[in-house]
């Protein structure tokens, strides 16, 4: 599949209004009143996208220049190279070799790449990399066990996670379109970590943070009850630390 130089524009008059392509959706909708099990089974050896543009606007909602707005999305210069080896109701196996785009809020994704394999029991991500103008985040591996999950609370508390963040550089200014307070944080933080546990109870068994030559932290950290702010607490152990 190759998509070069395309523009895809979605629009609503109000949040409750139908999309401007609703007539297309209706045309392909099944007329059968008896619901049938969807049997999706797709494979794309190669999906190439270049110079793509995508927009989504809800006309009744205010625009917020310089700040990301989910009601006014404007993506330019979308490029991607993807291999979808399997996609069906039970599993997914995909390789995003490279994806990049610019968003009108000022957010720029220079590169996204990853391998993902998932089924009903687990999901495994390998060689995840995100590059922003001054950020390079690398996750060597990430795995979540979904075998005991039957609800959202179970996902938060009963889905074991294993995560490895290889040495990375984070610049909070790159995220300022989402969090305007980060606009003045132009310095880079070096980060690496090894973590496991659950979404709601996270154990950073190895954490290294370095800020230029002004700050260094090496240690461990536990975050408990993350989704319950009134009950959240942090327990840490410092192996080495200095601030100048």
Walk through the language-model features, giving the residues of each.
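Transmembrane beta-barrel domains of outer membrane proteins
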Residues: 41, 117, 194-196, 220
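Solvent-exposed loop/turn segments connecting transmembrane beta-strands
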Residues: 102-108, 131-138, 210-218
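Membrane-embedded beta-strand positions in outer-membrane beta-barrel channels/transporters
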Residues: 7, 53, 113, 141, ...
């Amino acid at each position: 599949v190759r998509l070069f130089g395309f523009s895809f524009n979605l629009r609503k008059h109000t949040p409750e209004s139908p999309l401007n392509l609703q007539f297309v959706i209706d045309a392909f909708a099944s007329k059968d009143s008896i619901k049938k099990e969807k049997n999706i089974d797709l494979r794309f050896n190669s999906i190439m996208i270049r110079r793509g543009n995508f927009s989504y606007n809800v006309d009744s909602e205010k625009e917020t220049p310089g700040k990301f707005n989910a009601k006014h999305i404007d993506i330019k210069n979308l490029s991607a190279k993807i291999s979808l080896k399997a996609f069906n109701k039970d599993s997914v196996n995909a390789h995003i070799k490279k994806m990049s785009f610019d968003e009108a809020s000022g957010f720029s994704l220079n590169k996204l790449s990853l391998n993902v394999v998932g089924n009903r029991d687990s999901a495994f991500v390998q060689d995840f990399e995100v590059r922003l103008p001054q950020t390079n985040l690398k996750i060597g591996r990430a795995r979540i066990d979904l075998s005991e999950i039957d609800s959202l609370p179970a996902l938060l508390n009963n889905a074991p996670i294993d995560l490895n963040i290889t040495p990375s550089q984070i610049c909070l200014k790159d995220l300022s379109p989402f969090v305007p307070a980060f606009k003045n944080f132009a310095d880079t933080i070096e980060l690496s970590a090894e973590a496991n546990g659950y979404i709601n109870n996270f154990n950073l068994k190895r954490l290294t943070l370095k800020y230029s030559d002004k700050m260094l932290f090496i240690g461990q950290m536990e975050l408990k009850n993350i989704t319950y702010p009134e009950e959240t607490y942090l327990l840490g152990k410092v192996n080495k630390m200095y601030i100048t």
